[in-house]
Amino acid sequence: MSLNFSRFQYISNIFFILIISFPGGLIYLLIGSTLSFWLRESGFDKITIGLFSLVNFIHIFKFLWGPLLEKVSFAPLSKRGYKYCLIIALVSCIFCVYVLTNFNPNTHFIPFALCLVAVAFFSSIYDMLLQSSQMLLITNKNWGISEAACTTGFRIGILIAGSGALYLSTIISWQDVYRAMAILCIPSLLLIIIYPLKFKDKIIINDFDRFWHAFYDFVKKPKWLIIVSFMLLYRLQDNFLSVMPNMFYLDIGYTKKDLALGYKAFGMCATILGGFIGGFLCRKYEYSYLLKRVLIYHALSSLSFLFLYFYNRDITSLYIAVFFQEFTKGLTMSPFFSYQLRCCSAKYCITQIALITSIAYISTILFGSISGYAATYLGWTYFFIVAGFCFIPAYILIRYLPPYVISS
């Protein structure tokens, strides 16, 4: 009986993680790629749309309030404190998204932008709590399953906020689309409220000094500056492109319905497939070899943009181009995430993961914000040519990474 109950508790915890991961992916895209379509239809130029990437700057600093969040959520109230923080973070996200829909980005630019920053802030808190839920609810040997559940829920949220929102926008206004997306978060909120949390271990409260110990431990690593530089530059191509592919597809004549199915839905499937294959290749090849190869493959995907621009703009060509772009993007993701874990010490893994993901996010914000300028002043042809060469800095740095990072 006890064994059956434990198994039931394990399965229900996995299901809980899957469901609460859904709002994370949904909100992530609402203030990212999907937002660019709304801004485009509101008359904003590519430069301004690119600058809206700066609303996510708040994610860079999430490692600073991580220890504070642990103190507030875990120390006084234990399970209830953790649940209350989850509820407050998600309710705040839903509320801010709803408030956002009451502002027109053209006539109420500053309130609109401030609402986006608020959504980004509360979503960063929700993401941290979501990541910790796996460690609190699931035993170590089952983290692989819980990560798969978390990724699945997150990707479903991205799919709904991408393909679903884009398709809905052809029927109703963008304000109503965002209201509908906010409503879709409510089932996850209700589950958080009613679900009985059972932590597998007693919660250990980290001291604030732990962050500084974790930081010092990281900077003691051999060639840590090269490790950080590689982390900043590895996804330079994707960060430089940012949301500009959305603008490109619209400029060359594709409709939002075309993009909802071909770019968002089909592209998401291609990314997931590439991620699984990339994960398998991590077990087969040394990192130094694999990282170089996937960087080159993904760099070549820029040619698909030029193919569409100069030669063929039918639906079949869109699907082929999107598959090439998103599949190779997926290939690059698994080795990179594994690389991030290899950079962490086991005893400081949570704090250091928060730290290095914040570092990686700097590249997303910095290069994403200038993508609009680059696309405007270079034109689409040279913009995608430059994007294709963005792999070179990271490719060069691979040979200088310490062996414990890139050796199998």
From Swiss-Prot:
The chain crosses the membrane at residues 11-31, 49-69, 84-104, 109-129, 154-174, 177-197, 224-244, 261-281, 294-311, 353-373, 378-398. The keyword ATP-binding does not apply. It is a multi-pass membrane protein. GO terms for molecular function: transmembrane transporter activity. SUPFAM superfamilies: MFS general substrate transporter (SSF103473). GO terms for cellular component: plasma membrane. InterPro entries: AmpG_permease/AT-1 (IPR004752), MFS (IPR011701), MFS_trans_sf (IPR036259). Keywords: Cell inner membrane, Cell membrane, Membrane, Transmembrane, Transmembrane helix, Transport. Its main location: membrane. The keyword ATP-binding does not apply. It is found in: Cell inner membrane. Belongs to the major facilitator superfamily. This is Putative transporter AmpG 2. The gene is ampG2.
